[in-house]
From Swiss-Prot:
Swiss-Prot/TrEMBL GO biological process terms: ceramide biosynthetic process
Keywords: Endoplasmic reticulum, Glycoprotein, Lipid biosynthesis, Lipid metabolism, Membrane, Signal-anchor, Transmembrane, Transmembrane helix
Function per UniProt: Component of the ceramide synthase complex required for synthesis of ceramides.
Protein's organism: Candida glabrata (strain ATCC 2001 / BCRC 20586 / JCM 3761 / NBRC 0622 / NRRL Y-65 / CBS 138)
Name of the protein in its database record: Ceramide synthase subunit LIP1
Subcellular location: Endoplasmic reticulum membrane
Length: 144
């Protein structure tokens, strides 16, 4: 007569899998914490300056950052900021993006002096369209 099969307890395997999972989660959180402290080193940060007085909706936008913030990163950051900050359902939007041709496409501003921005955008609602048109003279003005 044989004894019935009884599976071995798997509790130790469960603890091993749980420990490895928690270690991976901790590693990801530590990386996120480290990059948050040095965010500017890894990403482009938008810089905004109001143009045309306190009641104006017109902003001058450019991007700054560390080595990964080249012209492509600046462009993406500027467009992302325009699309998030302005609501075209409230009022139509006009903007232009001027390229600084004296800045190389791939530039690595490692030091505190980031140099000139590769792109500068002027954006505002159509109630301030005249100001946007003046600032964007010589470039294409886009509308949302």
């Amino acid at each position: 007569m044989s004894t019935p099969y009884t599976p071995a307890p798997q509790i130790f395997n469960l603890f091993k899998v749980l420990a490895v999972s928690l270690a991976l989660i901790a590693a990801v959180e530590y990386f996120k914490y480290g990059t948050r402290i040095n965010y500017e080193w890894f990403h482009c940060t938008p810089v905004m300056e109001r143009v045309g007085g306190p009641d104006s909706s017109v902003l001058k936008i450019w991007a700054r950052g560390g080595p990964s913030c080249d012209k492509r990163g600046e462009y993406k950051t500027i467009l992302k900021r325009i699309s998030r900050d302005y609501e075209p359902n409230d009022e139509h939007l006009s903007f232009c993006i001027k390229e600084n041709m004296s800045v190389d496409p791939v530039h690595y501003p490692i030091h505190e002096d980031k140099g000139e921005p590769g792109y500068i955008a002027y954006v505002g609602y159509d109630s301030d369209k005249r100001t946007v048109d003046e600032l964007c003279e010589g470039t294409t003005v886009f509308h949302f």
